Amino acid sequence: MSSYANHQALAGLTLGKSTDYRDTYDASLLQGVPRSLNRDPLGLKADNLPFQGTDIWTLYELSWLNAKGLPQVAVGHVELDYTSVNLIESKSFKLYLNSFNQTRFNNWDEVRQTLERDLSTCAQGEVSVALYRLDELEGQPIGHFNGTCIDDQDITIDNYEFTTDYLENATSGEKVVEETLVSHLLKSNCLITHQPDWGSIQIQYRGRQIDREKLLRYLVSFRHHNEFHEQCVERIFNDLLRFCQPEKLSVYARYTRRGGLDINPWRSNSDFVPSTTRLVRQ
């Protein structure tokens, strides 16, 4: 269990509780979680973060009524800046989006502006929103993470409790390499409900070479770990930076969707440009 799982800041969340579904617009349904909850234990301070990045959300279940009452549907793309005070709690996001279902809006841009305003207010940070008509995305190919997959290793694993021990002495030699490693075996659990979160992760770095077996064991150790997606990515970035000391580092995870939403956080200290195309499990 994370050290802050019972923090007072989490007590008021609807997550893990029985809730009513509202279908008329209600911005108060959105709930934020302070990023400081996981950053403080990691020694990360808001005014001196070792990374940049965004939390990329895809909204697959977004619908509202136009001015004449005709239902509209869209796929939404949301980017929440890493400097925001709060992350957005996903169940509250789902409930909030449901409140659009029977609400009339004059046009698509009014919907986009409403989302942008409400999410920015909840997160206390910068948010950008784009809405796509379905025919704009039809035929879009399934994406993939560029890099070398480290999953197919003939090793025995018997520990699934989170530990950074595997990263001790995980680099070798003095030669500087630049490589991108990928794993589809990332699995963590919701901080509150402990429901499984499934993801793929891309780690791009420049520095002394990281032992792939040790890295895979470290990633698999998240299997019983309880934290939100964004918190896991920041923990992985921080641990790799601390133990492996790369000159450049980027960590990007794309998680499978739940409740019509997927969350795809990335953190980097270099010029990293994430691909936003959904992966095969998304």
UniProtKB/Swiss-Prot annotation:
GO CC list? cytoplasm
Chief place where the protein resides: cytoplasm
Q: Where does NADPH bind?
A: S90, K91, R258, G259
Q: Which UniProt keywords apply?
A: Cytoplasm, NADP, Oxidoreductase, Queuosine biosynthesis
What metabolic or biological pathway is this protein involved in? tRNA modification; tRNA-queuosine biosynthesis
- GO MF annotation terms: preQ1 synthase activity
Q: Report if keyword Protein transport is assigned.
A: no
Q: Does the keyword NADP apply?
A: yes
What is one GO biological process annotated to this record? Answer: queuosine biosynthetic process
EC number of this enzyme: 1.7.1.13
Cellular location of this protein? Cytoplasm
Pfam families attached to this UniProt entry? QueF (PF14489), QueF_N (PF14819)
Tell me, in a sentence or two, what this protein's role is: Catalyzes the NADPH-dependent reduction of 7-cyano-7-deazaguanine (preQ0) to 7-aminomethyl-7-deazaguanine (preQ1).
Kindly state the subunit structure of this protein: Homodimer.
Q: What's the protein name?
A: NADPH-dependent 7-cyano-7-deazaguanine reductase
